[in-house]
């Protein structure tokens, strides 16, 4: 298992080792000890989700209040998506920047998205099934969004992207910042310290 940090701090790309034979393929797509050794933090699983999307569907940009926050560990179990991680943490040195990873049922790559980061993916196959592990249960009142087509963020999405009504009505980054909706960098750092395995 190879794990590398992305351009947005506290986000990681995970490439599992696949074992193929005449029967098919076996892989470990999440392994706590390898994850903790590479990232220096724990992943306390609280919920697992699956979404199925047709080509062109965009889900995001989503994030949760910090504290409590909700980290995610995401993979495409069927089909393919382009997965985006956006830094929404006010005060972060990389605030407003983003990185992306191609997730598909060939490479079987995964992405870890730390608390306070925004998350979006676009389905690039006819159908894409995505599995998420999360560190907190879904809490509707603490879940928020930023508009996926916000030009200030500049994700390479097309204007005809298929959005939910909620995502289409989400504020821009500037509006979310002005309203105090976004996570604070210092609050996120406190949370990262709390889940750190360093020195434990």
Q: Where do the protein language model's features map onto the residues?
A:
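Extended, polar beta-sheet/loop recognition surfaces of beta-rich domains
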Residues: 132
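Conserved metal-binding segment of the jelly-roll/cupin
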Residues: 103-126
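Non-catalytic, conserved peripheral segments adjacent to functional cores
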Residues: 1-106, 127, 137-200
């Amino acid at each position: 298992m190879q794990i590398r940090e992305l351009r947005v701090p506290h986000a990681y790309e995970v490439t599992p080792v696949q074992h193929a034979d005449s029967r098919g393929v076996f892989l470990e797509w999440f392994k706590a000890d390898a994850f903790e050794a590479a990232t220096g933090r724990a992943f306390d699983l609280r919920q697992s989700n699956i979404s199925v999307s047709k080509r062109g569907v965009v889900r995001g940009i989503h994030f949760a209040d910090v504290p409590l926050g909700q980290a995610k560990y995401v993979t495409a179990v069927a089909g393919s998506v382009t997965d985006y991680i956006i830094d929404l943490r006010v005060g972060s040195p990389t605030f407003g920047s983003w990185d992306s990873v191609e997730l598909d049922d060939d490479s079987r790559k995964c992405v870890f998205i730390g608390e306070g980061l925004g998350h979006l993916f676009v389905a690039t196959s006819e159908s894409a099934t995505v599995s998420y592990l999360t560190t907190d249960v879904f809490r509707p009142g603490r879940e928020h969004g930023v508009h996926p087509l916000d030009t200030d963020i500049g994700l390479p999405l097309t204007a005809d992207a298929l959005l939910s009504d909620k995502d289409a009505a989400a504020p821009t980054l500037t509006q979310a910042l002005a309203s105090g909706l976004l996570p604070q960098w210092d609050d996120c750092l406190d949370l990262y310290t709390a889940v750190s395995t360093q020195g434990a």
